[in-house]
C-alpha cells in the first residue's frame, strides 16, 4: 500500500488544505478537507497523521515535506524566536509524536515532478486534493 499526502497553506486565513490518496493495488481512495493551522509545516504533519489513520498503519506514507520528516525524526534544530514560532513549534512536535506513536514508515519524494511514474502521479494527486481542501474552506464563506 502506498499513501501520498500533502498540504496547501493559506497564511492570511490560517488554514491548510489537506490531501491524501491511498493506492492499494488497483484500488484508490482519496480524501480532501481543511484544518486551522499556524504554518504549512503543521498542515503537512497533520496530513501525514491523517494518512496514517486512513491507511490503518499499513504500507508507506510519502510526503514532499522535508521539514515534516525532520520533525518526525527529531532532527529539527531551529530555536523559535517569537512566541508565535514557539507555539507553532510545539504544535509541530505534537503531531510528529502522534505520527511516531503510530509507527508507520514515512519517506520523502520530490515535489512537483512532471513524470508519469507512480510516485510523481501520487504526489500530484495529493497536491490537487490539498488545493481542493482549501477550496472547500473558501466555498463556506
What do these predicted ranges mean?
Residues 1-42, 46, 50-57, 73, ...:
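RNase H-like nuclease fold core
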Residues 4-15, 50-124:
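RNase H catalytic domain
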Amino acid at each position: 500500500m502506498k499513501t501520498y499526502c500533502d498540504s496547501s497553506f493559506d497564511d492570511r486565513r490560517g488554514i491548510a488544505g489537506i490531501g491524501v490518496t491511498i493506492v492499494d493495488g488497483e484500488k484508490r481512495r482519496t480524501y480532501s478537507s481543511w484544518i486551522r493551522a499556524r504554518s504549512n509545516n503543521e498542515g503537512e504533519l497533520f496530513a501525514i497523521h491523517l494518512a496514517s489513520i486512513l491507511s490503518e498503519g499499513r504500507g508507506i506514507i510519502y510526503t514532499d515535506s522535508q521539514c515534516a520528516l525532520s520533525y518526525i525524526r527529531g532532527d529539527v534544530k531551529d530555536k523559535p524566536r517569537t512566541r508565535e514560532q514557539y507555539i507553532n513549534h510545539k504544535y509541530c512536535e505534537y503531531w510528529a509524536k502522534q505520527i511516531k506513536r503510530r509507527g508507520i514508515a514515512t519517506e520523502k519524494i520530490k515535489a512537483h515532478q512532471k513524470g508519469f511514474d507512480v510516485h510523481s502521479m501520487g504526489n500530484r494527486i495529493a497536491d490537487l486534493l490539498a488545493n481542493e481542501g482549501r477550496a472547500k474552506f473558501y466555498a463556506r464563506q
